C-alpha cells in the first residue's frame, strides 16, 4: 500500500491533475488509469515517441497532441469541472481554459472504454524509448 501511495504522489506532477484524470477514467472505463495506462504503449503515461502501438495507445497520442493546443492556461495544474452521464464525460464550468483541458481529457476518457477488448497486456510497461524507434507521427 505504501508503494502505491508513493507512486501516486510522484505521478501527480507528471501529467497534470492526475488524480482528477484517474477518477474520470475509473468512472468511464471502470479501471485504473494509473495501473492500466500509466506506462502503456509509446504514449500512455509520461512523454512519448514513435508510432502508437494500438487503439488505446493512439488515444493517448491524441491526448498528448491536444494538450499542446490548449492555450492561456496550465493543463498540468488546473482543475476542471465535469460530470458523467450514461457513461460519457460531459464538460462543465464557465472558464474557457479549463473547459479546453476537460475536452482533451473527455476525448480520451470516452475512447478508452471502447478499446478495452483490444488492450494488449504485452505492451504494458512498454519501453518506448528502446523499441519505439520509428519517427513520431505529426499531431
Swiss-Prot record:
Functional note: PLA2 catalyzes the calcium-dependent hydrolysis of the 2-acyl groups in 3-sn-phosphoglycerides.
Entry note: cofactor: Binds 1 Ca(2+) ion.
Annotated family: Belongs to the phospholipase A2 family. Group II subfamily. D49 sub-subfamily.
Protein name: Acidic phospholipase A2 BpPLA2-TXI
EC code: 3.1.1.4
Top enzyme class: hydrolase
The keyword Calcium belongs to this UniProt entry's keyword annotation: yes
Keywords from the UniProt entry: Calcium, Disulfide bond, Hydrolase, Lipid degradation, Lipid metabolism, Metal-binding, Secreted, Signal, Toxin
A GO cellular-component term linked to this record: extracellular region
UniProt xrefs under CDD domains: PLA2c (cd00125)
Tissue occurrence: Expressed by the venom gland.
Chain residues that bind Ca(2+): 45, 47, 64
Xref: Pfam families: Phospholip_A2_1
GO biological-process terms attached to the record: arachidonate secretion; lipid catabolic process; negative regulation of T cell proliferation; phospholipid metabolic process
Major place of residence: secreted
Molecular-function annotations in GO: calcium ion binding; calcium-dependent phospholipase A2 activity; phospholipid binding; toxin activity
InterPro entries: PLipase_A2 (IPR001211), PLipase_A2_dom (IPR016090), PLipase_A2_dom_sf (IPR036444), PLipase_A2_His_AS (IPR033113)
Amino acid at each position: 500500500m505504501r508503494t502505491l501511495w508513493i507512486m501516486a504522489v510522484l505521478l501527480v506532477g507528471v501529467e497534470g491533475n492526475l488524480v482528477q484524470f484517474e477518477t474520470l477514467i475509473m468512472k468511464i472505463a471502470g479501471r485504473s488509469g494509473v495501473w492500466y495506462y500509466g506506462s502503456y504503449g509509446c504514449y500512455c503515461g509520461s512523454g512519448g515517441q514513435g508510432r502508437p502501438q494500438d487503439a488505446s495507445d493512439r488515444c493517448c497520442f491524441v491526448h498528448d497532441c491536444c494538450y499542446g493546443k490548449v492555450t492561456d492556461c496550465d493543463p498540468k495544474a488546473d482543475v476542471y469541472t465535469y460530470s458523467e452521464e450514461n457513461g460519457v464525460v460531459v464538460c462543465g464550468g464557465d472558464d474557457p481554459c479549463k473547459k479546453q483541458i476537460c475536452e482533451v481529457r473527455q476525448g480520451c476518457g470516452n475512447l478508452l472504454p471502447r478499446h478495452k477488448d483490444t488492450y494488449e497486456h504485452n505492451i504494458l510497461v512498454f519501453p518506448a524509448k528502446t523499441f519505439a524507434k520509428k519517427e513520431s507521427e505529426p499531431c
